[in-house]
Amino acid sequence: MIASVRGEVIDIALDHAVIEAAGVGYKVMATPSTLATLRRGTESRLVTAMIVREDSMTLYGFADADARDLFGTLLGVSGVGPKIALATLAVYDAPTLRQALADGDVTALTRVPGIGKRGAERMVLELRDKIGPVTTGAGVTAVGGHAVRGPVVEALVGLGFAAKQAEEACDKVLAADPDATTSSALRAALSMLGKK
């Protein structure tokens, strides 16, 4: 198992980064917020989880071990694969997700692309006792009052847009479509910024 990758960031895309370590470029799938912490040409370290399937070997990268461990816990839920687990961590950071699971907040979990009401109920049922310590908080909140705003803004900044420009584009997209998912909001914001 590859537990972490450290090296020069060669490329950053919407859903992955390529990190060169010892002459080998590792494609690491990651959330927009994790990708936003990386810069091309700089040395970075990501904690990783390696998922081996019959037809693929995929690395998933995280900013810290806590997020990686929660990713592994999410994979234990029937019907939740690596893509949905990563999408969940793209919408909610680890403490917020733990709080949603502890509170049984099915509505918050259904905001994650790919998770319906039944899937959210299954997650709460299977993970409520496995999620680890929950920090005290006021329930599930998101940056700017919207669950997808933070990850979308961070992804846009990671792609080279100015923070103010990214925030304005994201706010316009979310004002037009308050129920937008992270991926659809990011696509719409990129389209909007591309027209300027």
Swiss-Prot record:
InterPro entries: DNA_helicase_Holl-junc_RuvA_I, Hlx-hairpin-Hlx_DNA-bd_motif, NA-bd_OB-fold, RuvA, RuvA_2-like, RuvA_C, RuvA_C_sf. Residues 1-63 are annotated as: Domain I. Signal peptide: none annotated. SUPFAM superfamilies: DNA helicase RuvA subunit, C-terminal domain (SSF46929), Nucleic acid-binding proteins (SSF50249), RuvA domain 2-like (SSF47781). The keyword Nucleotidyltransferase does not apply. Has three domains with a flexible linker between the domains II and III and assumes an 'L' shape. Domain III is highly mobile and contacts RuvB. The RuvA-RuvB-RuvC complex processes Holliday junction (HJ) DNA during genetic recombination and DNA repair, while the RuvA-RuvB complex plays an important role in the rescue of blocked DNA replication forks via replication fork reversal (RFR). RuvA specifically binds to HJ cruciform DNA, conferring on it an open structure. The RuvB hexamer acts as an ATP-dependent pump, pulling dsDNA into and through the RuvAB complex. HJ branch migration allows RuvC to scan DNA until it finds its consensus sequence, where it cleaves and resolves the cruciform DNA. HAMAP family: DNA_HJ_migration_RuvA (MF_00031). Homotetramer. Forms an RuvA(8)-RuvB(12)-Holliday junction (HJ) complex. HJ DNA is sandwiched between 2 RuvA tetramers; dsDNA enters through RuvA and exits via RuvB. An RuvB hexamer assembles on each DNA strand where it exits the tetramer. Each RuvB hexamer is contacted by two RuvA subunits (via domain III) on 2 adjacent RuvB subunits; this complex drives branch migration. In the full resolvosome a probable DNA-RuvA(4)-RuvB(12)-RuvC(2) complex forms which resolves the HJ. This is Holliday junction branch migration complex subunit RuvA. It comes from Mycobacterium sp. (strain KMS).
